[in-house]
Amino acid sequence: MQLPSFLEVYKGLISTDSISSTDPSWDHGNEKVIEKMAQWFKDVGFSVEVVEVEPGKHNMVAKMGSGEGGLLLAGHSDTVPFDEGRWNFDPHALTEHNNRFYGLGTADMKGFFAFVYEAAKKMDWSKQTKPLYVLATCDEETTMLGARHFTENAPFKPDYCIIGEPTSLVPIRGHKGHVANAVRVTGKSGHSSDPALGVNAIEIMHEVLFALMQLRDKLVKEYHHPGFAIPSPTLNLGHIHGGDSANRICGCCELHYDVRPLPGISLDGLDNMLRSALKEVEAKWPGRIEITPLHEPIPGYECQHDHPFIGGMESVCETESQTVNYCTEAPFLQELCPTLVLGPGSIDQAHQPDEFLSFDFIDPTIDVLSKSIRKYCF
């Protein structure tokens, strides 16, 4: 049987819509791209299991070899939505132009599975001693549903995991988490000519903002990690809206903010800090302040700094590991085994119009994956 080429697999991945979104009109599911991946990896000799996590949402686990431990190569199969008016190329077609592959998911990150496929296809498996697993998840771009489900139900425990997000082939050993909340203040609207007739939600929100800014200063003073370029947690006031007219007392005001906690700060502990910061304002204005999460919180992640896996992959990649401020599925997969984030392409291309991956990454990525498989599965 003639196996598909690297380019054919890459084109198949990019041409198959797998957008995930919290907006139902954009949430297209990943079943079709998972079906294609499952067949490609079966053709190379993997045993494959596809798990429906939710209707239209699937994870794929492919396995080559037997025994305990081994290496897990992981990533997400979904992409973000796109603004068609800002793209010069078809997002759902792999376009080769100026030594680049253009298309939605070329860098972030379902294109990674074409590299895994190619490395596996070229491998001589006759002396394999430990299994190689390939995990493709759903909904990383929204809820991390696929990674959460896999971690909670994992039928095996690999020795190590590599997540193929775009890191320019630099091993990433840690990143901050992400927590985003909405604070909704409900006042009482009325005519602005008599403030006593109402309760101004914007004025209450002013007190909320002051309390959160005090907490922001406290986080900077009390938490520090020298491994990060921005060594403290960050708290950002990102969006606010209130009122409907200059001559009305504002009856409702809503704030959206996010916090990026360092590794080691527990989500429960952070939630307690956030709620404690607003405790006095809530006591002053009972029943008028509501706090709700904007998405499932994501903890910070760090592979133990002296773990031999870091040194081993630094040797394979011939570069030192780093930390970053964006989020991946690593906090969840790290619960199973030491995990690094490492893949082709630049994070600068993620979620951008005309997303691309440079041809310069093709051979080095296949080489790094091949060396990693031989190092941890042979």
From Swiss-Prot:
Residue numbers annotated as active site: 78, 140
Location, primary (coarse class): cytoplasm
Pfam families: M20_dimer, Peptidase_M20
Compartments where found: Cytoplasm
Domain of life: Bacteria
Main enzyme class: hydrolase
GO BP term, example: L-arginine biosynthetic process
Residue positions binding Zn(2+) 1: 76, 108, 165
Record's protein name: Acetylornithine deacetylase
Classification lineage: Bacteria, Pseudomonadati, Pseudomonadota, Gammaproteobacteria, Vibrionales
